[in-house]
């Protein structure tokens, strides 16, 4: 599979032999940057954290909503990395304006899902602290379109599992195009991962098929562009 040549700085990191497009950059940040970012995450005020089943998170930049996001200024420790990633051109002419910080303890995960239409169809993720496996799945409705025999449609996550990507600490992952829009993604709640040939980016990583990796606490910075932003003046009823 050939690179699209839209992102010359990323072309050499394209994960091959999978639907377009995933770019995996190991050691995107240094260990000292990782330590700095983790300090900033855990120094955030307690009200910034939201506890969900299987993870907890922080929203930075605003709360995305179907009617529009009331944009908030990003802190400088995040702005540096949103600027860096935006400069790669992955959001077109736009700059990232939203960061979701997730914390996953070993044994935690998130069910297969799609990010939905509130976001520009590209997601970028910096991983901190520990590895994980990001799994991709064929949606049931896509399988229904591709087979004429309803009985053959896979019904379980295991049957619909298409591929996985190993996300190592300090790595950057960019997912866009068909892989972003046509497939579900999730993280299986496990305490360890045995790497199989289904892990599509082993050739881009330091790990090997058959390795078993123990999960620790992982923090992810999910950096995106939210196109629909509300102006504060409109929210306050001004500018009529």
Curated annotation (Swiss-Prot):
| UniProt cross-references to Pfam families, sorted A to Z | 2OG-FeII_Oxy_2
What detail does the entry give on cofactor binding? Binds 1 Fe(2+) ion per subunit.
Residue stretches in coiled coil: none
Q: Which Gene3D superfamilies match?
A: Alpha-ketoglutarate-dependent dioxygenase AlkB-like
In which residues is Fe cation bound? 113, 115, 185
SUPFAM superfamilies for this protein: Clavaminate synthase-like
What are its cofactors?
Answer: Fe(2+)
| Enzyme class, first EC level, given as a word | oxidoreductase
Q: Which residues bind 2-oxoglutarate?
A: 102, 104, 218, 220
Write out the GO cellular component annotations.
Answer: cytoplasm; nucleus
Cellular localization per UniProt: Cytoplasm; Nucleus
GO molecular function: any one? Answer: dioxygenase activity
Q: Which key words are in the record?
A: Cytoplasm, Dioxygenase, Iron, Metal-binding, Nucleus, Oxidoreductase
Principal localisation: cytoplasm
The entry assigns this protein to a family as follows:
Belongs to the alkB family.
Q: What is this protein called?
A: Probable RNA/DNA demethylase ALKBH6
Source species = Xenopus laevis (African clawed frog)
């Amino acid at each position: 599979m050939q690179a699209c040549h839209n992102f010359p700085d990323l072309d050499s990191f394209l994960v091959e032999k999978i639907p377009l497009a995933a770019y995996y950059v190991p050691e995107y940040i240094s260990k000292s940057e990782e330590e700095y970012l983790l300090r900033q995450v855990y120094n955030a005020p307690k009200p910034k954290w939201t506890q969900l089943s299987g993870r907890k998170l922080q929203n930075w930049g605003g709360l995305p909503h179907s009617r529009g996001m009331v944009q908030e200024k990003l802190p400088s420790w995040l702005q540096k990395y949103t600027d860096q990633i935006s400069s790669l051109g992955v959001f077109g002419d736009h700059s990232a304006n939203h960061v979701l910080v997730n914390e996953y303890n070993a044994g935690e995960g998130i069910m297969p899902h799609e990010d939905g239409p509130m976001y520009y169809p590209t997601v970028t993720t910096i991983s901190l602290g520990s590895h994980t496996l990001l799994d991709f799945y064929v949606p049931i409705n896509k399988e229904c379109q591709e087979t004429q025999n309803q009985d053959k449609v896979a019904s379980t996550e295991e049957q619909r599992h298409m591929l996985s990507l190993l996300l190592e600490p300090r790595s950057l992952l960019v997912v866009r195009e068909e892989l972003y829009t046509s497939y579900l993604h999730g993280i299986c709640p496990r305490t360890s991962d045995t790497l199989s040939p289904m892990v599509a980016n082993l050739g881009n990583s330091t790990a090997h098929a058959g390795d078993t990796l123990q999960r620790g606490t992982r923090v992810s910075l999910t950096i995106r562009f939210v196109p629909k932003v509300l102006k504060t003046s409109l929210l306050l009823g001004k500018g009529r």
